[in-house]
Amino acid sequence: MPSPEKVYLIDTNVILRYLLNDHKRFGPKAKTFMQDVAEGSKKGELLSVVVVECVYVMEKFYEIPKNEIVDKLSRILNIKGIVNPDKSKILDALVKYENSNADIVDCILAAKSSPQRVVVSFDKDFKRLKASYESY
């Protein structure tokens, strides 16, 4: 029986070095890795928590505008070799983030909510985000 295909869990620093190309040593390595993922010779999983950290760092540290953050991360998520069972929800969350004043965590919660998966929060943003939620 063949062994299962290896999937790489991609850390925030790899995504940031790839997107920003701001490190002489790690930028080219990140680019090579992401090219391998794009070509299909490697599979990479981009977890929601990594997306959150990428948004935070790009927004707060690099002061990149929301629309650019969303564009960059959406392009990453749409790479052929990127896997994530919640990919469509994360992409939806990025759109919510771009079009609101809510933070990315609230946007992910809203995107993942449904009548059977209700967000509980004191935050009123969820109504504007069209989430299934209950306020206490």
Can you say where each PLM-predicted feature lies in the sequence?
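Short beta-strand scaffold positions
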Residues: I10, E45-L46, N84, I104, ...
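Short, well-structured N-terminal submotif of metal-dependent ribonuclease cores
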Residues: M1-E45, F61-N67, L129
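Short, conserved alpha-helical segments within structured domains
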Residues: L46-V50, K89
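Active-site-proximal, substrate-binding regions of enzyme catalytic domains
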Residues: E53-I79
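Acidic, PIN/NYN-like endoribonuclease modules and their adjacent C-terminal/linker elements
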Residues: M1-V7, A110-Y136
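Regular secondary-structure segments
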Residues: M34-A38, L77, L94-E98
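Active-site phosphate/pyrophosphate-handling residues
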Residues: N13-V14, V55, C107-I108
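Active-site neighborhoods of divalent-metal-dependent phosphate/nucleic-acid chemistry enzymes
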Residues: G81-V118
